[in-house]
Amino acid sequence: MSSLSGKVQTVLGLVEPSKLGRTLTHEHLAMTFDCCYCPPPPCQEAISKEPIVMKNLYWIQKNAYSHKENLQLNQETEAIKEELLYFKANGGGALVENTTTGISRDTQTLKRLAEETGVHIISGAGFYVDATHSSETRAMSVEQLTDVLMNEILHGADGTSIKCGIIGEIGCSWPLTESERKVLQATAHAQAQLGCPVIIHPGRSSRAPFQIIRILQEAGADISKTVMSHLDRTILDKKELLEFAQLGCYLEYDLFGTELLHYQLGPDIDMPDDNKRIRRVRLLVEEGCEDRILVAHDIHTKTRLMKYGGHGYSHILTNVVPKMLLRGITENVLDKILIENPKQWLTFK
């Protein structure tokens, strides 16, 4: 049993799980996302280089990955601080920051934000998708990768003494690469030793979550302490979703606020809107999965911040929750989704 057993590890240290309150389990506060830059068509190249102002805001919102400035969330720390204070004023208590190695994790900024806002912030250990892996990462053995993950939780990340409280988001592509497979195996090994929470970013195929769970299981992971992110863009078929739900992991709908005609990172995917997400959450509740549902926004670009006319980190609490109540999801179930389920997941075994 780990010395962390029964606690949640935030960037400010260990806290009692009961202190968290309403928790968003998949967000970003300080990161860069250049790895997913999508060059615009030649006829739109000029607007892609303009600053973020009202006249081009709609274009940037709909072409988020074709505007380089939009991908630099780490430039907006003061705006994010204001948003976290607003989140807290609207009943928020904690936020899981999913930025890992490869997309500019900054634990020192996370610590400062936690100190200045009073929001509990949990940082993620590990590696993002293969496209961000360094040659050193690719050369590591599973054992060496396991050591890295454990060190970031037990001793500190980014050359600091600030410790991560989860492993993830662990990035997976489709098809999965050999380097990503090793990271998944290392994740399972570290989790088996530490009893820590794990969260996964699956590739953009409905088969990806199934494959990932199988690899984790074979390597000794605790699936009951593991979250599968981005189900709203990954498993769209109802029958397939219910089949996946039987595998026992947490089921995360974490793109609330994202409503797109064209999803740049997966052009074949018809991105659902928030009403569809709510219907999926209600379906999972009706099927007896209410103890394993999590929700978030996965904010990772500037134009999703309130400063730039976006929905911000309080959208679920201020807009989505009232609509969920209207659609028959009870207060008790919402407390499970927002408080109890995150608490259970984030608590070390």
Curated annotation (Swiss-Prot):
Listed GO CC annotations: cytosol; extracellular exosome
Sample GO molecular function, one term: N-acetyltaurine hydrolase activity
UniProt KW keywords: Cytoplasm, Hydrolase, Metal-binding
Major place of residence: cytoplasm
Reactions listed under catalytic activity: N-acetyltaurine + H2O = taurine + acetate; N-propanoyltaurine + H2O = propanoate + taurine; N-acetyl-L-methionine + H2O = L-methionine + acetate; N-acetyl-L-isoleucine + H2O = L-isoleucine + acetate
Compartments, record wording: Cytoplasm, Cytosol
UniProt enzyme class: hydrolase
GO annotation, biological process: catabolic process; epithelial cell differentiation; regulation of appetite; taurine metabolic process
Pfam families membership: PTE
UniProt protein name: N-acetyltaurine hydrolase
The encoding gene: PTER
